[in-house]
Regions:
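A compositional/structural signature for long, glycine/proline-rich flexible linkers
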Residues: 1-392
Length: 392
């Protein structure tokens, strides 16, 4: 067959070219940036865009609310919008006119949440969190999703498109068991119809538009915090809603960090009693930094505590010699995201920028320290945990 052999060829060609033109135009987002103007930031900027291509196609084309299939939103090699290294994200689109059922087993993962958002990021229709999920003695559970209420676990669907967002927060990466889970539309149905040119054309248009708008959204997010470097801010951009849209029960704080090669940003805080807490690094493009081979995040089960129950965390280019280290991986600017989950208090960590060389004399005599052998063991367990959570 050759071009022109079907009546749809011209439309398909135009749709593909327009999609590719949108991808090409996004380069201005990287080259016009002033925050991350190093070679590393440029390279990771285009990596950011390349990852968004697959996300755009998954979000706006490779899904059908009538035949829902859960897919992994974030992985170690496909990241976006401040992904949490502790978290496995499962998502799919649903139609508010239908009824769906989730079935699965809770596993032993530290914390889970089920969220139904509208078509817009800042609209939440319903949520079930860790403490609200009703399970059987063996950990099995079922959740109904519909516009009309059901007994037991139920998530309300809004009219039109609904985005199901499932989070699993792992504390001990190398031991906790993930949920087993599936979703289906209730009823008897024929298999989905074959792909049509019309659906492909519509999907490419929607994916291209979403790629342009959403990739810019997270570049703007980091810029929102950049005028207050090395300090914590709980406010979020106006389009993000009340700051808790992502998962009810969370309290989020953000810090735009700016650190030279001989500096360290020291956080100190006494964590409150809570279901889960963490600190995580993201680069200028709001992608988590390498968490398989570097210490780019820390949670309550991984942390080493001081005698008084506090934690001391160093964000730096070089190993500071204390247990809780966040390795910037060559970046000089980026974000730290911090979460308290199901906590009665939400303390703000102290933040102090120092010279790495000054750290030993600034530490109290009884401060926790770490040997090179202990650091290697930390990293070994970390890689095992990532490989276990994201098997081939």
């Amino acid at each position: 067959m050759a071009y022109g052999d079907t009546p749809y060829d011209e439309q398909l060609k135009r749709a593909w070219e327009e999609f590719c033109d949108k991808l090409k135009s996004a380069q201005s987002l990287i080259f016009n940036d002033t925050l991350g103007a190093t070679a590393l930031d440029r390279a990771t900027g285009f990596q950011y865009l390349s990852r968004y291509i697959s996300k755009a196609l998954s979000e706006k084309f490779e899904n059908d609310p009538l035949y829902p299939q859960l897919w992994q939103l974030q992985t170690p090699t496909n990241k976006s919008f401040g992904d949490n290294p502790d978290c496995t994200y499962l998502v799919t689109w649903l139609d508010g006119a239908h009824t769906y059922k989730i079935a699965g087993n809770r596993g032993t993962v530290s914390w889970v949440s089920f969220l139904v958002n509208g078509a817009e990021f800042n609209i939440t229709h319903s949520a079930i969190n860790n403490s609200q999920l009703k399970t059987e003695w063996d950990g099995s559970f079922q959740i109904m999703l519909s516009a009309q209420q059901h007994p037991g676990n139920w998530l309300k669907l809004g009219p039109g498109p609904n985005f199901l967002f499932i989070r699993q927060f792992f504390g001990e990466w190398d031991t906790e068991e993930p949920m087993w889970i599936r979703v289906e539309r209730v009823g008897d149905f024929e298999p989905p119809p074959p792909l049509t040119p019309e659906r492909l054309i519509r999907g490419l248009e929607n994916a291209g538009n979403w790629f342009l708008s959403d990739s810019k959204r997270w570049v703007d997010w980091v810029e929102f915090y950049s005028d207050q470097p090395n300090q914590w801010v709980s406010k979020m951009p106006g389009w993000a809603g009340d700051g808790q849209t992502g998962s009810l029960g969370r309290q989020l704080q953000f810090c735009y960090w700016k650190i030279q090669s001989d500096e360290a940003l020291i956080f100190e805080v006494k964590p409150p009693r809570c279901a889960y807490w963490n600190f995580e690094l993201a680069n200028r493009w709001f992608n988590s930094t390498d968490y398989r081979y570097r210490f780019s995040s820390l949670n309550g089960k991984q942390a080493v505590y001081e005698d008084d129950g506090s934690v001391r965390i160093a964000v730096s280019h070089v190993d500071p010699g204390i247990p809780n280290w966040l390795d910037v991986g060559g970046h000089c600017v980026g974000m730290v995201n911090q979460r308290w989950v199901e906590a009665q208090e939400h303390p703000v960590p102290t933040a102090k920028l120092i010279k790495v060389a000054d750290l030993p004399r600034l530490l109290p005599p009884n401060a926790r320290r770490i040997t090179p052998e202990q650091r290697r063991e930390q990293l070994r367990r970390r890689k095992i945990g990532v490989d276990r959570r994201f098997p081939v």
